[in-house]
Amino acid sequence: GSSGLIPMGRV
């Protein structure tokens, strides 16, 4: 994951 609309896990 990443910093998006829904950050899942790692940012």
UniProtKB/Swiss-Prot annotation:
Modified residues (Valine amide): 11
Name the UniProt record assigns to this protein: Periviscerokinin-1
Domain of life: Eukaryota
Swiss-Prot/TrEMBL keywords: Amidation, Neuropeptide, Secreted
The protein's role, per its UniProt record: Mediates visceral muscle contractile activity (myotropic activity).
One GO term describing the cellular component: extracellular region
Compartments, as annotated in UniProt: Secreted
Family as reported in the entry's similarity comment: Belongs to the periviscerokinin family.
GO BP terms in the entry: neuropeptide signaling pathway
Principal subcellular localisation of the protein: secreted
Record InterPro entries: Periviscerokinin
Organism: Blattella germanica (German cockroach)
